[in-house]
């Protein structure tokens, strides 16, 4: 059993614990996007820390540079890759104050079985509406064990972004893995205040 949490408005980071034994939890990993110093910090299960500069070559598996304020509660869900089911954490990249386009407007999928390394980052489109898009809301997950209507293995995820757009994100064995499909657009502007901060229900 894995517990994963972020710092909310307090930072741009997440950590994960193995709480299979509640009285003896084990640290799994943590990562932080330091936007002030333009650095990525990553801690593995042994507590070893890596410090990676934006200016150097950051491999995709450690590229958390789009992580904003960590509002999004991670969805721990099954994903099908190469006909194998694996458990991952998926979350939106968080809040950017509505003004900074450098981070926040993405969805992350990370490997819970390999120190939280990034499996995929998918960026959300930013339209011309005077809002710097981001995704502070948590994702909604629909899994095969949660509904008899599901004819797939893995998970479908749904998320709203700050600009009022709704997206479907595919982590199933049907269609294209990591496919991101727009399903609704509220056409948010600063004037109409249709911005989305919360999880869809």
Regions flagged by a language model, labelled:
Residues 1-201:
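A fold-level detector for beta-propeller and closely related beta-sheet-rich head/sensor domains
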């Amino acid at each position: 059993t894995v517990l994963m949490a972020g710092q909310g408005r307090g930072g741009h980071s997440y950590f994960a614990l193995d709480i299979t034994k509640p009285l003896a939890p084990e640290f799994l990993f943590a990562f932080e996007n330091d936007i002030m110093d333009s650095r990525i910090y990553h801690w593995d299960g042994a507590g070893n820390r890596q410090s990676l500069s934006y200016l150097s070559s950051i491999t995709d598996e450690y590229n958390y540079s789009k992580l904003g304020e960590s509002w999004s509660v991670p969805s721990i869900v099954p994903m099908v890759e190469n006909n194998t089911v694996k458990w991952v954490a998926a979350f939106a990249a968080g809040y950017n104050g509505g003004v900074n386009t450098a981070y926040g407007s993405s969805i992350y999928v990370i490997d819970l079985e390999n120190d939280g390394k990034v499996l995929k980052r998918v960026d959300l489109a930013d339209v011309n509406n005077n809002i710097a898009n981001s995704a502070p809301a948590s994702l909604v997950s629909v899994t095969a064990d949660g509904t008899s209507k599901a004819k797939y293995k893995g998970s479908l995820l749904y998320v709203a972004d700050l600009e009022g757009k709704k997206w479907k994100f595919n982590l199933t064995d049907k269609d294209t893995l990591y496919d991101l499909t727009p399903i609704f657009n509220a056409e948010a502007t600063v004037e109409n205040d249709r911005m989305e901060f919360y999880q869809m229900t």
